[in-house]
Curated annotation (Swiss-Prot):
InterPro entries, A to Z: NAD(P)-bd_dom_sf, NmrA-like, NmrA-type/Isoflavone_red_sf, PCBER-like
GO molecular function, one term: 2'-hydroxyisoflavone reductase activity
Protein source organism: Glycine max
Binding site for NADP(+): G11, P12, T13, G14, A15, I16, G17, R36, R44, R148
UniProt-listed PANTHER family: ISOFLAVONE REDUCTASE (PTHR43349:SF53), PINORESINOL REDUCTASE-RELATED (PTHR43349)
Name this polypeptide is given: Isoflavone reductase
Its biological purpose: Reduces achiral isoflavones to chiral isoflavanones during the biosynthesis of chiral pterocarpan phytoalexins. The reduction product is a third isomer, which represents the penultimate intermediate in the synthesis of the phytoalexin (-)-medicarpin, the major phytoalexin in soybean.
Gene name as annotated: IFR
Lineage top rank: taxon: Eukaryota
Keyword flag Oxidoreductase: yes
Keywords: NADP, Oxidoreductase, Plant defense
Lineage: Eukaryota, Viridiplantae, Streptophyta, Embryophyta, Tracheophyta
Root EC class: oxidoreductase
Catalytically driven reaction(s): (3R)-vestitone + NADP(+) = 2'-hydroxyformononetin + NADPH + 2 H(+)
One Pfam family this sequence matches: NmrA
Length: 318
């Protein structure tokens, strides 16, 4: 019986990448990460303060102790990238929004290596082929869609992973700006609060990504993570929270017109976060029918995966 595929994670120390690494190790896949000989700059402004306390150095040491294979290399060194890719079967990219175009370097290296069974480009959000978002989010989605088209044109085997709303961005503050825990007095709700959204923890994204990587049925498909107990409206989530704290929050409903105005007037990261919230809570970009010829619903494809529900996730803040 053949062993499990060897998996390379690019961007392994990010908010999602680390969870993919840990899930790969747990699943028994030989796991590889690309690490730079010299540290890169980190002067960018993050969307939210990471809930993950580990430094990159601590993560790399943790990976090493877990049996992860560390490959020295650099995204800007084509030869080292090709060398890394030749050692594996599956390549998973978990780059942030500022590095989407850098995936062109990965695509070129995959083409030269000629051995990759599957490439997961950096998606991990809403479906970039099904959305009605506004800038600055739309610009990022269009970049990701362009990467999809290049992958397809080059004939590279792929899986696209659409996980919608991370709990770290959307749930730990009930999609409120400038706070890091759920509010206990008042809450702002975009639109009428009755549009379904899909929520998932970063750890569960890691688990489901590796499930898809080990699933031949996910080849050249888009995997959609819309877990049944986490497919909720913001009103339903607020009701769950109110029941936990035994208090009714003061609710202010914000019109789409006002949200769009706020997006234009806000600076980063608030304009980006508001555009994400607008996409899911007002435009309903997590509400659609899948095409079984090219899509998989994760909860149906991997029914044995136990996941953290929204209800369970909120317990830590009570």
């Amino acid at each position: 019986m053949a062993g499990k595929d060897r998996i390379l994670i690019l961007g392994p120390t990010g908010a999602i990448g680390r969870h993919i690494v840990w899930a790969s190790v747990k699943a028994g896949n030989p796991t590889f990460v690309l690490v730079r000989n010299t540290p890169g700059s980190n002067n960018r402004v993050n969307l939210v303060k990471a809930a993950n306390p580990e430094t990159k150095e601590e993560l790399i040491e943790s990976f090493k102790n877990s049996g992860v294979n560390l490959i020295q290399g650099d995204m800007n060194d084509h030869e080292s990238l090709v060398n890394a890719i030749k050692q594996v079967d599956v390549v998973i990219c978990a780059f942030g929004r500022l590095l989407i175009e850098d995936q062109l370097k990965i695509i070129a290296a995959i083409k030269e290596a000629g051995n990759v069974k599957r490439f997961f480009p950096s998606e991990f959000g809403l479906d970039v082929d099904r959305h009605d978002s506004v800038d600055p989010v739309r610009e990022v989605f269009e970049e990701k869609a362009r990467i999809r088209r290049i992958i397809e044109a080059e004939g590279i085997p792929y899986t696209y992973l659409c996980c919608h709303a991370f709990t770290g961005y959307f749930l730990r503050n009930l999609a409120q700006i400038d706070i890091t825990v759920p509010p206990r007095d008042k809450v702002f709700i975009l639109g009428d609060g009755n549009v379904k959204g899909a929520f998932v923890t970063e750890a569960d994204v890691g688990t489901l990504t590796i499930e898809a990587a080990n699933d031949p049925n996910a080849l050249n498909k888009t995997v959609h993570i819309r877990l049944p107990k986490n497919y909720l409206t913001i009103n339903e989530i607020i009701s769950l929270w109110e029941n936990k704290i035994g208090k009714t929050l003061e609710k202010t409903y914000v019109s789409e017109e006002k949200v769009l105005k706020d997006i234009k007037e806000a600076s980063f990261p608030n304009n980006y976060l508001l555009a994400l919230y607008h996409s899911q809570q007002i435009k309903g970009d997590a509400v659609y029918e899948i095409d079984t010829a090219k899509d998989l619903e994760a909860s149906e494809a991997y029914p044995n995966v136990e996941y953290t529900t929204v209800d369970e996730y909120l317990n830590q803040f009570v």
